[in-house]
């Protein structure tokens, strides 16, 4: 997919992919409005600074799951231990479509991830 914008990326997805990826994008927009997503590495990504090494969260769609990517491998390892229904990929957690419980668990830990990078934003949670 050669999307130039987040809305274009979402428009290129099938209905199931679009529903789940859009839900995560909506969550990030509602809880962390100061983080603006952009397309990087062909997926919607929220940079915590100006460069990727300063931290990022991203989302991507695959055939049977969607992935939420994190720049911190140790955080991802801890997170995946509590998500037995999900597989861990390279710097990402793969959530099967329809697994709302795992998605909500990941969303609940986004603020913990942001604290690793001393991100000065605050969630409305």
Residue ranges, per PLM feature:
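Charge-dense, helix-prone N-terminal extensions
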Residues: 1-125
């Amino acid at each position: 997919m050669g999307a130039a914008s987040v809305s274009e990326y979402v428009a290129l997805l099938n209905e199931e992919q679009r529903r789940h990826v859009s839900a995560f994008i909506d969550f990030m927009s509602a809880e962390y409005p100061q983080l603006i997503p952009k397309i990087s590495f062909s997926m919607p990504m929220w940079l915590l600074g100006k460069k990727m090494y300063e931290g990022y969260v991203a989302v991507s769609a695959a055939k049977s799951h969607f992935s939420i990517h994190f720049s911190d491998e140790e955080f991802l390892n801890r997170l995946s231990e509590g998500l037995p229904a999900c597989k861990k990929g390279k710097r990402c957690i793969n959530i099967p479509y329809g697994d709302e419980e795992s998605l909500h668990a990941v969303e609940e830990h986004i603020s913990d991830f942001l604290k690793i990078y001393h991100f000065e934003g605050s969630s409305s949670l």
